[in-house]
Each structure stands twice: as C-alpha cells, then as structure tokens.
C-alpha cells in the first residue's frame, strides 16, 4: 500500500499532467477552427477543378493527343501510394487509422502480385508503415518545420509524383488521407491521382447539357490542367489532414483531462481514507495508553 507521501506526490503529478492536457486541448481547439475553415474553403475549388477536368477529358476521350497523365501507361503493375499522416502524435487513433487503411491496401496489392512503392507525408505514418514495408518506402516528406501548410508544399509533392511517372517508376498513383467530417469523425480516404480520375464528378459532367469550346484545344488545356489538379488534390488532402489532426487532438486531450480528473478524485479519496485510518489508529493508541495509566 502506498504511503501518504507517495499518494500526495502522485496527486501533484497527475494535476500537473492535467494542466498540460487542458492547455493542449485549448491550443488544438484554436488551431482546429482555422484548419477547418481552410479545409472547407479548399473543397469547392478542388471539386470544381475535378469537374472541369472531367468535362475536358470527355471532350478528348481516348484520343492519341490525350496526355499520358490522363490515359496512364495502359498497365497497373506498379502502384505508388502517397500516404498523408501527421508529423506529431497525441491525437488518438488519427495516425494509426489512416496508416492501417493504407497498409491493408498495400497487402491487397502485394497479394495480387503488384509492385508497390510508398511516399510517406508525415513522420507518424512513416514510423508505422516502415515496421512492415520499410523496403517499399522510396521517399518521406518532412513537414515538421512547416508552421502553416501552403500550396507550395503540395506542389512540391505533386511535382515529385509527376517526375516519377515520367521516369516510368509507376503506373497508378493513389493518395491516402483522412477526410475531415467533424471533431470526432475523420474518414480514411483513397483518391486516384494518376491516371487522372474525375471521381464522383464524372456523373455530373455526363449529365451536363452545356457544350464547350476549348482554345487552343482540349488536349493542350489538359496538359497544363492535370499537373495543377494533382497539386490541388494533394493540397486539399493536406488541409483535410490538418483539420482532422486538430480535431482528434482536441478530443484526445479532452478525454485525457477528464481521465486525469477522475484519477485525482480516486487518489484523493484513497489519501483521505488512509489519513483518516492513520488518525484513528493514533487516537486509539493515545486512548489505550491513557487507560493503561
């Protein structure tokens, strides 16, 4: 049984930890608001960009003039996975959730006999995936020194992906990230980048009755648009990730603060009981000694 001094020290230690978790919760809450606004602002642009891409892609079709980033290599033997996670922890299961989602996809591809290459954006995903797939990781993007995610960060990743494609390093590229839904809900998401996929907006483009004319021509526009779209989609993924990370961190620190409060109450109760028992014992000894006299 711990002594009164040990219990007192533990109570003080838990109280100090509670102050830290409470402060981290408040910081995460402040950052969450800004991150959520940035993520929500990026969605319409990225969705509209994909819609425009789908419309122009329909005009070009399978024409020989269509850029390789849209048509692909015609194979799907080698897959490049760009996995976006956080640089830091203390955000519950946020990082493990997206890493697990990507890991399951890697296992599925390997079981099909495909070659897999991975680019890790964020330290935590890198730490998790390298335990099993260290030989598959070809690059790691370090954003620890980046205070605010900017388009230039996504653009560098996009250029790296396109450079690898032009060198014939892969056939299909898929982006993995956590889509922010709410403070307690972040959904692991996979989005194909190459060959350029219009995704759910393709149906919208199919049903559109408008007819567009393109200058100089649709293929030339696609050649410029697809690389930008890749960077835009990566940028949106990074912003969604930041919002999800802050939401998960705020929730985790809130739980930690409440758990610390419960632990303090239990330790204080235990401390008071032991102190009461000790005082009672001393009183009994005093009374017994007085009666003996």
From Swiss-Prot:
SUPFAM superfamilies given in the database record: ATP synthase (F1-ATPase), gamma subunit (SSF52943)
GO annotation (BP), single: proton motive force-driven plasma membrane ATP synthesis
Record carries keyword Ribonucleoprotein: no
S-S pairs: none
Main location: membrane
Residues annotated as signal peptide: none
Alphabetized UniProt keyword annotations: ATP synthesis, Cell inner membrane, Cell membrane, CF(1), Hydrogen ion transport, Ion transport, Membrane, Transport
CDD domains listed in its UniProt record: F1-ATPase_gamma
GO CC terms of this entry: plasma membrane; proton-transporting ATP synthase complex
Source species, domain of life: Bacteria
Keyword S-adenosyl-L-methionine assigned: no
Residue ranges of the TM segments: none
PANTHER family linked: ATP SYNTHASE GAMMA CHAIN, ATP SYNTHASE SUBUNIT GAMMA, MITOCHONDRIAL
Function comment: Produces ATP from ADP in the presence of a proton gradient across the membrane. The gamma chain is believed to be important in regulating ATPase activity and the flow of protons through the CF(0) complex.
Name this polypeptide is given: ATP synthase gamma chain
